Amino acid sequence: MINRNRGSGTRVLIDNRLHQLAEELGVGFDKICSELDGYDTEARTHSAVAAAVKLNRVDVGIGIRSVAESNGQKFIHLADEEYDFIMQRSFVESKIGTDLLNVLCSDEFNSCLPPGITSYKRTGEFVDFD
C-alpha cells in the first residue's frame, strides 16, 4: 500500500479505520500497522497515490474518486468528507464574498463538479463562532 502523509485528512481516516480494526481483532494498532507493507510510505497528494498505483509501485492506496477515475483506476467508496470555507466577516459581507457564495450555491456550479465531488446540502449556511 501507499499511505498518505501524517496530518492529512485521508491519513486520519486510514488510522481511524485501522484503530477500529485493531479493536475488533483484539490486537494493538501498532501491530496492525507493522503488518501492512507500505504503511510507512507516504504520499503528499491524492495524485501521488494514484500515480504509485498506476505505475505498479503499490497495489492500493487511499485517494479521492475524481483522481482515481481520471487515471482510469477502480475505486471502492470508503467515506464522505466535508470541507468548510473559513472567512472573515468582512469578506462574507463584501461583493466578492457574496458573489463567491452565489456561485458555490448555484446549480451551474454543481453541474460542473467531477464525479465523486458534490456540493453539501447546507452550502451557504453560516456557522458563526462569536
Range-by-range predicted roles:
Residues 25-48:
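Short beta-strand-to-loop elements that line the ligand-binding cleft
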Residues 69-102, 122-124:
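Periplasmic-binding protein-like
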Residues 50-79:
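A ligand-binding cleft/hinge motif common to bilobed small-molecule-binding domains
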Residues 38-42, 49-51, 84-90:
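Short, glycine/charged-rich beta-strand-loop motifs at protein surfaces that mediate ligand recognition
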Residues 1-19:
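Short loop->beta-strand "edge-of-pocket" segments that line small-molecule binding or catalytic clefts
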Residues 5-10, 43-46, 51, 57, ...:
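Conserved mixed alpha/beta catalytic, RNA-binding, or beta-rich assembly cores of soluble enzyme
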Residues 4, 23-26, 90, 107-130:
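N-terminal hydrophobic or amphipathic helices and topogenic motifs
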